Structures are given as C-alpha cells and as structure tokens.
C-alpha cells in the first residue's frame, strides 16, 4: 500500500521538533523498530535544522517543506527549502564541513543522514534552495505485542 503526506512550516527552530514528531507519527503505520524510528527522527531533525540555519540563516519568514511517501516497507522523505542553496554539494557532504564554524556541533548533519539512510541525494542551486531526498528500507521483523 502507498501512503503519503506533506508539511510546510515556518523556518523557526522550534518547528524542528514538530517536524520530527510528525514524520515519526506518520511512519509508525509501518511498525518500524525503535532503532529505525530513532534514525528517521534524527535525519529529519538534521535536514530541517540545515534548512533553517544554513538555508535561511535563521530568518523565520520562510517555509521548510517535507514530503513523506510510504510504499510497502520503504520510506521516502524529501526535505526542501528555498534558501541560499549549496555552492559545492560534495564539500558540504564532507564530515565536519560547515558554513557556520562559529556554531557548536556543526558539520555532521549530512554524515549522520548518510549513515542512517539507505540512499541520500542532495540537489541544490545557489539562491534557489536545497532538496534532500532520502530513502530507507525497513526491516521485515515486526514488533511483538503482548
């Protein structure tokens, strides 16, 4: 069965938690393991934070967009912004690279996303924004309920 949802929300850091919980709630219908659920929540958090901090420079009057598609046991998540874009995607995906070195704990977002997801594609153009496409195949083992 295929199911999908879309969200759009203001580019404020408080909405990162909302995005994480919304996607996690949506994917629970596939009965992911706790590890899978945690990984999905983490990648959503990282990608949304990248959009807010790097794409929009913490300016709150913009939108972050999420699309989530469930097909059988596969999850497809797209997180998109219309911000400043990424000049060099390969460089941005290098561990510890950040365009904001003054921020604590910067530079691991794409590395974390790539480690938790099966595939990650980043499409970006300067001054046009960035889209991060991610997929993950869930394990076939399901939760046992008492």
Swiss-Prot record:
Catalytic activity: L-seryl-[protein] + ATP = O-phospho-L-seryl-[protein] + ADP + H(+); L-threonyl-[protein] + ATP = O-phospho-L-threonyl-[protein] + ADP + H(+)
UniProt GO molecular function: ATP binding; protein serine kinase activity; protein serine/threonine kinase activity; sigma factor antagonist activity
BP GO terms, sorted: asexual sporulation; negative regulation of sporulation resulting in formation of a cellular spore; sporulation resulting in formation of a cellular spore
Keyword field: ATP-binding, Kinase, Nucleotide-binding, Serine/threonine-protein kinase, Sporulation, Transferase
Enzyme Commission number(s): 2.7.11.1
Gene3D superfamilies on file: Histidine kinase-like ATPase, C-terminal domain
Alphabetical list of InterPro entries matching this protein: Anti-sigma-factor_SerPK, Anti-sigma_F, HATPase_C_sf
Family (UniProt): Belongs to the anti-sigma-factor family.
UniProt-listed HAMAP family: Anti_sigma_F
Protein function: Binds to sigma F and blocks its ability to form an RNA polymerase holoenzyme (E-sigma F). Phosphorylates SpoIIAA on a serine residue. This phosphorylation may enable SpoIIAA to act as an anti-anti-sigma factor that counteracts SpoIIAB and thus releases sigma F from inhibition.
The protein, known as: Anti-sigma F factor
């Amino acid at each position: 069965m295929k199911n999908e949802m879309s969200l759009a929300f203001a580019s404020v850091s408080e909405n990162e938690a909302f995005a994480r919980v919304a996607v996690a709630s949506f994917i629970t219908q596939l009965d992911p393991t706790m590890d899978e659920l945690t990984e999905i929540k983490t990648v959503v958090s990282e990608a949304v934070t990248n959009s807010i901090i790097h794409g929009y420079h913490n300016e709150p009057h913009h939108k972050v967009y999420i699309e989530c598609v469930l097909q059988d046991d596969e999850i497809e998540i797209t997180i998109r912004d219309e911000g400043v874009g990424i000049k060099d995607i390969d460089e941005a995906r290098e561990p510890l690279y950040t365009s904001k070195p003054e921020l604590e704990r910067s530079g691991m977002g794409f590395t974390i996303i790539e480690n938790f997801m099966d595939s990650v594609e980043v499409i970006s153009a300067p001054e046009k924004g960035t889209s991060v496409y991610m997929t993950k195949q869930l394990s076939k083992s399901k939760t046992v309920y008492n």
